């Protein structure tokens, strides 16, 4: 027993010693943890690595937190941080640095960021270093577009690109923007050419969150590689691609309200009545007896007038706090051989005039981009595909003389918006008690009643490509792109009466139409880059073929069946009109098919990235012109000099980081006219043609001319053809410079250009 007791006692002591040792160790580790979590006041100086001068305004931030500061006039900073945290030092034009906190003093030297000049910009059928570009271009990054929270990329581009003017045509949700590059250069369509990932497309249907960058080719030298389509400039949109790494999921959304920034100040009832009385007095007549106009008063339950009706029609037409919202979900990632990027987007914008029921725009977007390298990168294949679906409803935009708001400016404030029964019509259509506004209309009622229309557009765009690089720097590429769109429009006009001049008492009407459009482009290029000592060359040759076709089908009906004369039932099948005279009509036809074939090339040279020369040439053939006039030639030449790289500029390098002067000349073309204007199509019609004998209404054949008798079928040219139609051309000469100053904090771009348009294409007045 004694031995057993001794062993138990020794075991107890051993365990106790182990427990005490473990406790002491735990306390030490805990104290170390507390020490490591101590907050330090970190100070230091930030200087330039090139000259040792202190940098003012450097951002110093604790990574992953909101804590931050900036350096003072001497480059000094002070910030609180914990040991082990990371400080991020950021400065415009300098490479960002991250340093882990290990003590109270951290001095940092930042180096200049050469990537600013080594950035690439998208040019025709390729990319190029920004400092080697010899034409006039402008770029906006996708991150800057996303910050704008707009429904259209064009809205985000407003005011961001010099030489590019973007204006809204009406401000209605989903309404297109008017874009001009370096002013109007033609009497016809002045819109630039839009290329989405190298293929023609509609920029208005792109989700802004999908955009990597937008580059605008402004001068003819930059755009001449696109020849016949580039007379009004070129807008190149590059969408986001996948990157090597683990799958990355992003989501962003916003929800906001929009209201008119300023509305027209209208006269209230008292001011309006005062002005009317002054008008009468100035004309020598007695002022109005306002008490005699029963229709302009509000009445109490006893039928006694209490106050004058006082309607602000502008305020009524507008809707405050119209909702706008957008949501985007993206997934991207990939491996060393395959990358992908997918996105889903939804945008909805309510109109500030009328509200959602009469002015609204909704869009759904889907996009997938992928790239795959095969055989150690010798072959690369991929695709960019997108689908968009748009639903919209809109009020009549019109012009400054005829639009939905015009009536609100003219309308008296003494008229009510609604009648006693809550409808828009009375008292405007009740002349027995509307003596003051017997000839007035209800602009709000007209807008809410007549805006029965819906437009739906589905668009699918895709291009697939294959690229082979059999030897280094020789790339042979083929791309096939398709743009298909299908649209459906429906409108309905009910019966209404707001005044003698604002009414429809005859028939209900419905209209439906459908459009289908198919645009196909096939592009083949071969490019090669090579160097000989300090001389760098790049060459590109290619051909492109394009084909467009489409169909249209439309119909209209009238006199909708009773019980089916409201918007939900307003379809062609519910109309009862039996003839064209009653409102029945239908038409369908194939759209004019067009084709274009192009051959192009480019040769570029630079010496030590100091002197640059580029040549381009394109030949376009278009079915819009007659034989002998179908082909046009569009050359360009441009040169640049990075003068800041010269030794004699050494003294300026303390403040001048980069200076390039450039000059260019080029010719571009325009074929934006209706197809086959060189032909004189023959049209047949049942009209008054009297040649020889013809059958009269009495069943007897007659000769000569008699207006009493019926008509006969005849044929005639619907227009005069112009067989000599040829290309409209635009020549531009450009001189400019690009500069970056003060550690790339200030960028200056200057251009002087002369633009001459020759052989204008326009339709003669009929």
List each model region and its residues:
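Residues on the lipid-exposed face of transmembrane beta-strands in outer-membrane beta-barrel proteins
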Residues: 239, 251, 329-335, 368-372, ...
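Extended, hydrophobic alpha-helical segments in both membrane/secreted and soluble proteins
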Residues: 366, 597-603, 611-619, 632-641, ...
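Short glycine/threonine-rich loop-to-helix capping motif typified by GTGT followed
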Residues: 627-631
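A conserved hydrophobic secondary-structure block that centers on an alpha-helix together
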Residues: 470-472
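Short, small/polar-rich motifs associated with maturation and membrane association
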Residues: 7-368, 373, 379-382, 461, ...
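Conserved small/polar residues in nucleotide/adenosyl-binding loops
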Residues: 1-8, 762-766
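Transmembrane beta-strand segments that form the barrel wall of outer-membrane beta-barrel proteins
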Residues: 347-348, 613-622, 665
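Surface-exposed loop/interface segments of Gram-negative outer-membrane beta-barrel transport/assembly proteins
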Residues: 244-310, 352-359, 367-459, 477-597, ...
């Amino acid at each position: 027993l004694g031995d057993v007791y001794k062993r138990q006692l020794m075991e107890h002591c051993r365990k106790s010693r182990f427990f005490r040792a473990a406790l002491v160790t735990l306390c030490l580790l805990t104290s170390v943890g507390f020490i490591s979590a101590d907050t330090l006041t970190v100070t230091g100086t930030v200087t330039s690595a090139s000259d040792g001068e202190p940098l003012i305004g450097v951002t110093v931030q604790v990574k992953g937190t909101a804590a931050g500061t900036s350096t003072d006039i001497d480059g000094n900073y002070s910030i609180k941080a914990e040991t082990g945290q990371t400080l991020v030092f950021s400065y415009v034009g300098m490479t960002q640095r991250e340093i882990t906190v290990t003590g109270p003093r951290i001095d940092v030297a930042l180096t200049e960021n050469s990537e600013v000049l080594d950035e690439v910009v998208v040019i025709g059928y390729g990319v190029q270093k920004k400092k080697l570009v010899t034409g006039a271009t402008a770029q906006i990054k996708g991150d800057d577009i996303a910050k704008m929270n707009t429904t259209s990329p064009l809205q985000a581009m407003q005011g961001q690109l010099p030489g590019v003017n973007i204006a809204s045509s009406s401000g209605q949700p989903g309404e297109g923007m008017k874009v001009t590059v370096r002013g109007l250069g033609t009497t016809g369509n002045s819109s630039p050419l839009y290329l989405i990932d190298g293929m023609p497309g509609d920029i208005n249907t792109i989700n802004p969150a999908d955009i990597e960058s937008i580059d605008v080719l402004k001068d003819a030298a930059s755009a001449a590689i696109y020849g016949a389509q580039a007379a009004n400039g070129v807008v190149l949109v590059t969408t986001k691609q996948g990157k090597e790494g683990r799958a990355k999921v992003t989501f962003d959304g916003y929800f906001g309200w929009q209201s008119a920034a300023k509305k027209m100040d209208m006269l209230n009832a008292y001011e309006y009545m005062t002005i009317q009385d002054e008008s009468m007095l100035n004309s020598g007549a007695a002022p109005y007896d306002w008490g005699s106009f029963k229709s302009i008063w509000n009445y109490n339950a006893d039928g006694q007038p209490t106050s004058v009706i006082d309607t602000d029609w502008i305020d009524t037409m507008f809707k405050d706090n119209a909702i706008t919202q957008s949501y985007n979900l993206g997934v991207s990632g990939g491996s060393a051989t395959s990358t992908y990027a997918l996105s889903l987007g939804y945008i909805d914008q309510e109109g500030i005039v009328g509200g959602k029921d009469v002015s609204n725009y909704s869009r759904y977007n889907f996009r997938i981009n992928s790239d795959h390298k095969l055989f150690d990168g010798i072959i690369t294949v991929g695709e960019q595909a997108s689908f968009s679906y748009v639903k919209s409803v809109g009020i009549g935009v019109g012009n400054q003389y005829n639009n939905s708001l015009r009536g609100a400016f003219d309308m008296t404030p003494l008229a009510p918006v609604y009648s006693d029964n809550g409808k828009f019509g009375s008292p405007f259509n009740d002349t027995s008690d509307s003596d003051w506004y017997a000839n007035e209309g209800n602009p709000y009622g007209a807008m809410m009643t007549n805006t029965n229309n819906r437009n739906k557009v589905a668009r699918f765009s895709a291009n697939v490509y294959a690229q082979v690089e059999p030897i280094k720097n020789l790339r042979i590429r083929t791309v096939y792109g398709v743009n298909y769109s299908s649209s459906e429009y429906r409108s309905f006009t009910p019966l209404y009466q707001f005044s003698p001049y604002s009414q429809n008492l005859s028939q209900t009407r419905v209209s439906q139409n459908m459009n289908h459009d198919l645009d196909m482009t096939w592009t083949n290029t071969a490019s090669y880059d090579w160097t000989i000592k300090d001389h760098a060359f790049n060459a590109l040759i290619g051909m492109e073929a394009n084909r467009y076709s489409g169909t249209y089908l439309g119909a209209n009906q009238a006199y909708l069946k009773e019980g089916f004369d409201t918007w939900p039932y307003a379809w062609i099948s519910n109309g009862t009109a039996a003839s064209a005279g009653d409102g029945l009509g239908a038409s369908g036809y194939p759209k004019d098919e067009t084709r274009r074939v192009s051959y192009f090339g480019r040769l570029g040279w630079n010496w030590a990235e100091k002197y640059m020369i580029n040549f381009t040439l394109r030949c376009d053939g278009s079915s819009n012109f007659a034989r002998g006039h179908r082909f046009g030639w569009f050359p360009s030449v441009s040169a640049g000099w990075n003068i800041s790289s010269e030794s004699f500029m050494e003294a300026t390098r303390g403040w001048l980081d980069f200076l390039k002067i450039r000059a260019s000349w080029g010719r571009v073309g325009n074929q934006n006219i209706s197809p086959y204007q060189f032909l004189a199509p023959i049209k047949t019609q049942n009209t008054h043609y009297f040649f020889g004998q013809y059958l009269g209404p009495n069943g007897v054949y007659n000769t000569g001319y008699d207006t009493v008798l019926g008509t006969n079928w005849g044929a005639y040219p619907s227009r005069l053809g112009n067989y000599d139609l040829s290309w409209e051309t635009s020549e531009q000469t450009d001189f400019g410079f690009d500069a970056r100053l003060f550690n790339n904090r200030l960028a200056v771009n200057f251009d002087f250009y002369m633009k001459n348009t020759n052989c204008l294409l326009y339709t003669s007045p009929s």
